[in-house]
Structures are given as C-alpha cells and as structure tokens.
Amino acid sequence: MNATDNTPQLMSAQDYRDSLRRCKPRVFVDGRQVDSVADERAFQPGINAVGLTYDFALQTRYAPLMTAVQHTSGRTVNRLSHLNTSSGDLLNKLEAVRLICQETGCAQRYLTHDAVNAIAQVSARIDDARGTTEHTDRFLHYLHRIQDQDLTLGVAMTDAKGDRSRRPHEQANKDSYVHVVERNAVHNGVRGIVISGTKAIVTGAPYMHELLVMPCRNMGREDADFAVCCAVPIDAPGLTIVARPAGRPGEKLEHGDALFSRKYGQSTGVCIFDRVFVPWDNVFFAGEWEHSGHLTYSYATHHRQTCIAARAGFGDLLIGAGALMCEANGFDPGRESHLREQMVELITITEGFYACGVAASVYGKADEHSKTFMPDPVFANIGKLLLATKIYDMHRIAHYVSGGLIVTLPGPDEDHNPETGARLSEVLRANPDVPYEQRIETARFIEDLTAGYQGGWYSVISLHGGGSPAAMKQEIWRNYPVGNKVELVERLLERGIAADGSAAAAPHDPARAITKNRQPGKCCDTGCTTPGQPVMVDLPTVVETLPSRLPHRESMQGLPKLL
C-alpha cells in the first residue's frame, strides 16, 4: 500500500546512530571487545549505509517510495519493514532498494523486509493448519512495535551447520545449529524459551537493533528442537557477536584510502547464543518442524528478488563510472565500437536481471494464508541466478573500458609530492577537457569497487548471498511449468485422443516426471495477476527520479559526488 499524507514518526540517520548507543551488545572485532558500536570506527561504513535508509525516508523527494502504509495498523512505516499487499508494493520495494544501493552498494536493511514478509506468511500458515489466529496475532503485535520504533532487524538464518552430510539432530556438536534447550523457562516472572547455538553469517549484526532467528533448512520430526523462529534484542544476555569490519574504514594501503568503501560497507558477524532467554511474545514458532521448509522457501524467494535490485544499484555505479573512465581516457563509446559493445553489454546485464525482478513483481500473487504478496519464484530465482553468475562479467567490463591504470596508479600521496606531483599530472592526463585529478579519482573509484578487497567481496556476496546458484537452479526447475510446455507439444503432435475420437492434448499424468510442474497464467487472463490489478502505484513526485528510469546523462551527474 502506498504511503498517504500521514506524518511518519520515523528516525533519521542520526537518530538511528543515537539509538545504537542505547544498546549494549557484546561485540568483538579485530581481536578486541567493542565499547560502543555507534562509535566504533570499524563499523562506520555499515552504519552509514543503514543510516541512508532512514534519511531517504524523511526526504520529500523519496518518501513516497521509501515509506508505505501498513495495512494492519494504518500507520506510515519505512518501506523496508512493510508487508506487501500488491504487485505495486513489490515493484516499489524493488525501486527503493535499487535507489539506496546506488548510493551505498549494499544498504543491508532490506533483509528486514524479506524476513518479516516470510514470517507473516508462515505464521498465517500455522494458524490455518490449527484453526487459530494465535501466531499471526503474536507476530503482528511484534511487527507493529518494531515498525513504530523504526527498528532495523538482522536476519540470523545461516547456521554454522557442522558436518554438512548430517542433519541437525545428528551433529556431534549440537551448537552447530541454534536450537531450543528449554521450553518452559521463567525469567523475571515472564515465560519463554531458552536457545543455544551458532548463526555463522549475519549481515550487519553489530549495528542491528534485534535479530530475527530463523531456521536455514527444511527440518524433520527429529529436528523439532532446531525448528525455532524468534526475535532477540541485540544486547540480550548470552548473545556474543564476533564481527569483521565494514568496508575499509581508515585502511591505509599502498594505493591510498578506498574512495567508496571507506564510506559505505557491510559488516557480518558470527552470532553465538549461549542459553539466551526469549519471552513467548517474541517466539513465532518453536518445534513446528513441518513449517521450517516453508519459511526458508518464502524468505529465499523474497530475498532473491530483493537482491536483484541491490545488485542493479551496483550495476548503475559501474555503468556511470565506466562511462566517466571512457571520457577521461579520451574515448567516446558512441564512436568507439569496441567500447560501445562493452558498455551495452554491461547495461544489458544490469537491466536484464532487473527485468526479472520486475517480472517477479508483476506475476507475484497473494499468499494463500496471509494474503500478503509473494514474488513469482521463477523470475525471482532466474534474476538472482543471472546476477550471481554475471557479476564477474560486470567487473570484467569495468576493467576493459577503464584500462590497466586502475591498478597501476601510484598512491595519492604522490599527487601532493613536490618532487613528483606536477609531472604526474602532466603525463597522466588524457582528455584535455578532463582534469588529471578527475581521471585518477575515477580510476581509483573503479579499483575500489572491482579490483580490490571490496570488489572480491561484491563477487562473493553476489554469488552466494541468498543461497548458492545450485539452490536457485533447483527452485527454477521445481517451479517452472515444464509440464505445460510438454503438453503443448503433445497437443500439436496430436498424441492425445479425446473420448469422441478427436485429437486432444495428452492427459496429465501425475506420475510422469516431465509433466509434474504445471502452472497457468504466464500468458492468460486467469493467471498470477488478475486483469486490472494495479501493477505500479502512482508516485507522481518520485517516478521521474526512480533509479531505473533516470536518463543516462542525469544518472552520471551524481557520481562525482561519491568520489
């Protein structure tokens, strides 16, 4: 639902930073304990990135995109903690994530959105199976609180896993997976559960307000203790976070400070739960093993579609920087066919996987239990698979159009060296209309994004974030209606015979492997999207500045501000 004129009670980036000072988590980074996450230098790029999601929601220009009205409360909330109720919501979420990732590379807070939408779906599913509203009521009470307080939630999903060939209950070390160790605990007069175990990869863990603990796989009956979904404050007793720095803050390398990742980056943390108490009000399920797979599937589908937008924002950075580098080198891609081909390939890759995200929104449909909207899983997984494998081509193209200068430049200290600076500025200038300083600044920017630590980091999170390529291929095959295509050809070949003796389509055989998957609607009015359903909500003050709609020249104008 699009935002109305309700005045949002939302935090700014500074408010967010101040709120972190009120939290006292047990966090370690670089071998030492952190006194204040908000003031820890190693986390500043990550805090800056999340902070942008707060400031953009308060800007008149972006508020219609970055905020929405929560249909269960009527309150204006940040888009990244909102439950989707239409294809328009899915599209606006996609545009919002692309917008913030153009600026930050990875804004991280969008994981909150993906998790709350998945938990809403599984809560309603459990209630429908039991004929109650208990789980939905409990989750909505929690959701409204975190929306009203404008909190950012981390997703603690990926367990340490131990021996990958064994299921959770078969592990020699039970703490390889987070699990329930006590179901009837009482703490300060409040009833709840106690959990222990390890979540190995938690995005932005140190500077989250709370963690959403979720199972990372399908569970069997024997794994019931490991089937737990709950919310844990970041400074809950018994929770320890062992983190890595976000970006490259203050790092002094032989080639100088990182132009992008000194400002924006992402920390991750290993989260160790040692008998952490969770009140029942914050427990969304505990022991309902048969629903773990559905939660994992729902979250993965939401998250893979969202990742499409995040990496499209990164693609925008490479397109703009690549064009600037061509210009600085004295080339016009419009005249140089080999550069034009490379730039068009980069544009095609970026907009190609983004189009899959758009299609996943358009063909999205209401979940049968919660009635909230779910992206189409086929297009969501195809788009994520494309970006996961094409990220390396995106880097290659940036390297091709830029030239070797991006990794061979002397360090920036030489720019100010009276013995070398003036001469370097003379001999390393190419296009007479582009100052030497701008050329080398753009080169170092591209190096930071593609050829250094940060470039490798973007490659790995693109490949494995949200699940491995093998997992995406499995979901594509599982959900794609191959059976419809088989039956189409069977009909054209007149292999089926109707009761009256006329040619007919071969009957669907549930036992036949290649016709198992059948799905109407990709090309008919009775499919996933009902005719007349709003696809894109009206955003008159924003639509001309949506990240996927900006003219090329205008999109390039903002880039030097990042350098």
Predicted region positions:
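Internal helix-loop-helix
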Residues: 55-153, 204, 210
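A short core secondary-structure module
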Residues: 202-252
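Glycine-rich beta->alpha junctions and the first turn(s) of the following alpha-helix
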Residues: 254-349
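Long, well-ordered mid-to-C-terminal structural blocks that present hydrophobic/aromatic surfaces
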Residues: 314-317, 321-393
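Gly/Pro-rich turn-and-neighbor structural signature
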Residues: 124-196
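Alpha-helix capping/hinge segments and adjacent helical runs
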Residues: 378-523, 538-540, 547
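N-terminal-proximal low-complexity accessory segments that begin disordered
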Residues: 5-54
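Basic/polar N-terminal segments that are highly enriched at the extreme N-terminus
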Residues: 1-18, 497-563
